[in-house]
Amino acid sequence: MEALVYTFLLVGTLGIIFFAIFFREPPKIEVKEKK
Protein backbone atom coordinates (compact mmCIF):
# COMPACT_ATOMS: atom_id res chain seq x y z
CA MET A 1 0.00 0.00 0.00
CA GLU A 2 2.84 2.38 0.86
CA ALA A 3 4.49 1.78 -2.51
CA LEU A 4 1.22 2.67 -4.26
CA VAL A 5 0.95 5.95 -2.33
CA TYR A 6 4.58 6.84 -3.08
CA THR A 7 4.12 6.02 -6.78
CA PHE A 8 0.94 8.14 -6.92
CA LEU A 9 2.74 11.08 -5.26
CA LEU A 10 5.71 10.76 -7.62
CA VAL A 11 3.52 10.57 -10.73
CA GLY A 12 1.41 13.48 -9.45
CA THR A 13 4.43 15.69 -8.80
CA LEU A 14 5.99 14.85 -12.18
CA GLY A 15 2.64 15.43 -13.88
CA ILE A 16 2.23 18.87 -12.31
CA ILE A 17 5.79 19.87 -13.26
CA PHE A 18 5.40 18.56 -16.82
CA PHE A 19 2.00 20.29 -17.13
CA ALA A 20 3.48 23.61 -15.92
CA ILE A 21 6.43 23.36 -18.34
CA PHE A 22 4.19 22.29 -21.25
CA PHE A 23 1.83 25.22 -20.58
CA ARG A 24 4.69 27.74 -20.22
CA GLU A 25 6.61 26.66 -23.36
CA PRO A 26 3.92 26.90 -26.13
CA PRO A 27 3.41 30.70 -25.72
CA LYS A 28 7.15 31.33 -26.25
CA ILE A 29 7.18 29.11 -29.37
CA GLU A 30 4.02 30.84 -30.71
CA VAL A 31 5.53 34.29 -30.18
CA LYS A 32 8.71 33.23 -31.99
CA GLU A 33 6.69 31.77 -34.88
CA LYS A 34 4.56 34.92 -35.19
CA LYS A 35 7.68 37.13 -35.23
UniProtKB/Swiss-Prot annotation:
It comes from the Eukaryota. The chain crosses the membrane at residues 3-23. InterPro entries: PSII_PsbT (IPR001743), PSII_PsbT_sf (IPR037268). One of its GO terms (biological process) is photosynthesis. Its main location: plastid. It holds the Pfam family PsbT. It is found in: Plastid, Chloroplast thylakoid membrane. The keyword Transmembrane applies. One of its GO terms (cellular component) is photosystem II reaction center. Keywords: Chloroplast, Membrane, Photosynthesis, Photosystem II, Plastid, Thylakoid, Transmembrane, Transmembrane helix. It is a single-pass membrane protein. Belongs to the PsbT family. PSII is composed of 1 copy each of membrane proteins PsbA, PsbB, PsbC, PsbD, PsbE, PsbF, PsbH, PsbI, PsbJ, PsbK, PsbL, PsbM, PsbT, PsbY, PsbZ, Psb30/Ycf12, at least 3 peripheral proteins of the oxygen-evolving complex and a large number of cofactors. It forms dimeric complexes. Found at the monomer-monomer interface of the photosystem II (PS II) dimer, plays a role in assembly and dimerization of PSII. PSII is a light-driven water plastoquinone oxidoreductase, using light energy to abstract electrons from H(2)O, generating a proton gradient subsequently used for ATP formation. HAMAP family: PSII_PsbT. This is Photosystem II reaction center protein T. It comes from Zygnema circumcarinatum.
